[in-house]
Amino acid sequence: MPPLAPLPPLPSTTTAATTRFHASQGAAPHTLVLATEVPVALVINGIAHAVLMATPADLGALALGFLLTEGIIDQASDCYDLQIEPLSAQCVGLPEGIDAVQVDLQIAARCMARLQGKRRSMSGRTGCGVCGVESFVGLDLDCPPVPAAPWLAQVDAPTVLAAMQA
């Protein structure tokens, strides 16, 4: 794997051009502002602990909240250092266009000893497949697109609007 190369901060929102359909006005172009999500790896005292999907904003608060709610630390002051590093997809072995963030946390030795004594089991495999993975290496995000159902081409916007008003 190539060395980790930092990126500038990743955007927490993106825009998407869409078309809105109004029963009385017809179709009109529209722009949506959407939250973005990226894989975020939490690395505790140099050991990969978990990967989760998150909007790349306020990741320090997210990481501290995770440590507190998982019982890894007892209070925020048990976390001595926190570094947030955006990483390119190429650097962490993800498909092109899926950049990631690594949050490196340094916690008190007593908290780390407790964590190592009770290796956590975070099951999250029923969702998108990211939660519960310990590091970027365990991610399988190179999935083929799901083909559209054949019947979908037969449903147009006026039909959908009529069904919603029924």
Model-derived segments and spans:
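Intrinsically disordered, low-complexity regions enriched in acidic/Ser/Thr/Pro/Gln residues
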Residues: 2-166
